[in-house]
Amino acid sequence: MTTSTAAIVDEQLTAPVVGVDVGGTKIAAALVSADGGLLGPVAEAPTPAREGAQAVLDAIASSVTTLIDTGAPAARRVRLAPVAVGIGSAGVIDAGRGVVASATDTITGWPGTDIAGGVARRLLAAGVASQDLLVHVDNDVNAYAAGEAWIGAGAGAGSVLVVAVGTGVGGAVVLDGHVHHGAHFLAGEMGHMPSGTAGSEPCTCGRSGHLEAIAAGPQIARRYREATGAV
């Protein structure tokens, strides 16, 4: 089993792959064709973020297994051949190794987690993958940006900047068709930039005054409730 440092699209890839999005609140998985089309419904499951890294790896592997076992006919056929799995995860990801370089406490114990190896071993043990399984892991916003640059809003553009607001605030940069990771895998990240508006608001990283402390989805909702008295 291997991890990949492929560019946005491996032009030699013709078989479907499984795409997985791992966020702080949910895990979504789908079978995707080589041209980026969905081959069935998106399977979603809650992220056991407070149960630790191993529980999250279990949930990722379970989502992929369920998709292949009970998904569209194309998903069931993929069991008969080596399957590639692409995972976009919350946190700062060493994409070359498929390991979490650093992360906030949104997912307990996530820093240092070998996502690629952990998921590959679980899928092999479950009998839904072979030793030839290719697993590629990147930051979730990097993966999102790669998709937008390939066949989305940024298709045809030389450079693409993506800003994503969800449980946290993330950013990614695509240059000349490749995700730009930077020296420490942080290129494009803006959630933990200082923000004068944030003041002393606590951030999920343990510090205060960062953009994410006021601009992440939960914080937008909280600030709205505080300003309006809404419940």
Regions of interest found by a model, annotated:
Residues 21, 140, 166:
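Active-site glycine-centered loops adjacent to acidic/histidine catalytic or metal-binding residues
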Residues 21, 29, 45, 87, ...:
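Residue-level signal for inorganic ion chemistry
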Residues 1-16, 35, 66, 72-80, ...:
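Short, low-complexity, intrinsically disordered N-terminal peptides in bacterial proteins
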Residues 48, 53, 57-58, 80-85, ...:
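Glycine-rich phosphate-binding loop and adjoining helix at the ATP-binding site
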Residues 40-77, 112-114:
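N-terminal phosphate-binding loop and adjacent alpha-helix
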Residues 5-14, 32-33, 41-43, 52-55, ...:
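Glycine/GP-enriched mid-protein hinge/lid loop-to-helix segment characteristic of carbohydrate kinases
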Residues 25, 37-38, 99, 178:
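Residue-level signal for well-ordered, solvent-exposed loop/turn and beta-edge residues enriched
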Residues 13-32:
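N-terminal basic/disordered segments at the start of proteins
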